């Protein structure tokens, strides 16, 4: 049986993150032919195109982990009706320099959890738009917008 390596990108740095808990729950419930690795994004410098020719070690690590995966799982909160800056920063780093997009052609799932009544619906749509630009095919259905209440995790 083949094992599919999935890179998990959690768009939250919060210690008690709902989205990290959601990612952990997905990993526990997944079929055995999937292996998951959460990629670290909190140590990346802010993206600056001037650094494309001399990328930080943390950026090189991120790009290698993405390139070594068979697929992606993005688990994102929603901040002010969009994705968190830390997630966009990671996406920008791994897509650069031009022509060296580590995300390209990696199939992806998108999910998220929030205390807002619409969950992460708008953040997920924004993320899907960004990923489409980067040639990342995303699973269109089903969509899951998780409204977090006490006791969910």
Residue ranges and their predicted role:
Residues 54-135:
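Helix-loop-strand module that forms the ligand-binding subsite of alpha/beta enzymes
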Residues 10, 40, 112:
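Short beta-strand/turn micro-motifs composed of small residues
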Residues 1-7, 60, 137-153:
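Glycine-rich phosphate/pyrophosphate-binding loop and the adjoining helix
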Residues 15-18, 47, 82-83, 119-120:
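Secondary-structure boundary/capping motif
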Residues 2-33:
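N-terminal beta1-alpha1 ligand-phosphate binding loop
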Residues 33-46, 137-147:
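Short beta-strand elements in bilobed, periplasmic/extracellular small-molecule ligand-binding domains
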Residues 41-57, 153:
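N-terminal beta-loop-helix "entrance" segment that forms/cooperates
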């Amino acid at each position: 049986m083949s094992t599919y390596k999935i890179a998990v990108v959690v768009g939250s740095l919060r210690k008690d993150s709902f989205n990290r808990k959601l990612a952990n729950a997905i990993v526990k419930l997944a079929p055995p032919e999937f292996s998951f690795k959460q990629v670290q994004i909190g140590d990346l410098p802010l993206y600056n195109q001037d650094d494309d020719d001399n990328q930080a070690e943390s950026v090189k690590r991120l790009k290698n982990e993405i390139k070594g995966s068979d697929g992606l799982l993005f688990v994102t909160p929603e901040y002010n009706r969009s994705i968190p800056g830390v997630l966009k920063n990671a996406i920008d780093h791994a897509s650069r320099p031009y022509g060296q997009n580590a995300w390209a052609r990696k199939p992806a799932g998108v999910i998220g959890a929030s205390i807002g009544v619409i969950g992460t619906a708008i953040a997920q749509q924004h993320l899907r738009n960004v990923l489409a630009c980067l040639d990342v095919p995303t699973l269109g259905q089903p969509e899951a917008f998780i409204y977090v209440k006490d006791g969910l995790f």
